[in-house]
Amino acid sequence: CYFMYSFANTGKILEAYTEYRFLPQLTARIGQFKTMYTIENPMSPCFVELINCYSQAVNYLAGINGSDPLYGSNSGRDMGILIYGDLFKKKLSYNLAVMNGQGINLKDKNNQKDIVGSLMVHPLDWLSVGGSFVKGKGCAVAASSVNPDIAIGDSYTRNRWSAGATIQTKPVSLRTEYLAGKDGHVKSDGYLSLIHISEPTRH
């Protein structure tokens, strides 16, 4: 079992879930946890390179900081059930989930579920390539000036997808992604690329 609570502002539960490993290649998780959309969103803030943590595109499309008013501020998390694992001697990693699509600490307001999936291929020890998607129906928690046709409480199409790659070597690491979404009839997209250079350790 895992539990994470934030004491900031009024305080709230961020994560609460339990897991069971059926096979070395298959683990199931149920509860409230990070949505497996994009490479960046599931990452801990401790490992994200940016000063303000997550990138602008991921903040918006993954529903992290409230920059998408329709979805609200949900720290990139949701409630649901997830299966995940590694296949083919860890050359392929997969995640597949059924989520409420309403964010954290809220019951499903439209009885519609989101299907979330991601797939990463690791052809080389230092290279990973893959993508992810969210297909579902949102229920607007606030009005948005960029999407005025959707009112508070309306159900709307909320789809997302992404494609990206990571390169990990001792001196240099690279993470790059293209992500896009559609809320109702309004489309949005973004691109990010980060390079991290490590200085060799001197003894």
Q: At which residue positions do the language-model features occur?
A:
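Surface-exposed beta-strand edges and their flanking turn/coil or helix-capping segments
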Residues: 16, 42-45, 108-111, 143-146, ...
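Short secondary-structure boundary micro-motifs
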Residues: 2-4, 104, 148-150
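Detector for outer-membrane/organellar transmembrane beta-barrel domains
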Residues: 122-194, 198, 202
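Outer-membrane beta-barrel proteins
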Residues: 39-42, 53, 94, 105-107, ...
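Outer membrane beta-barrel
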Residues: 1-101, 111-116, 120-131, 194, ...
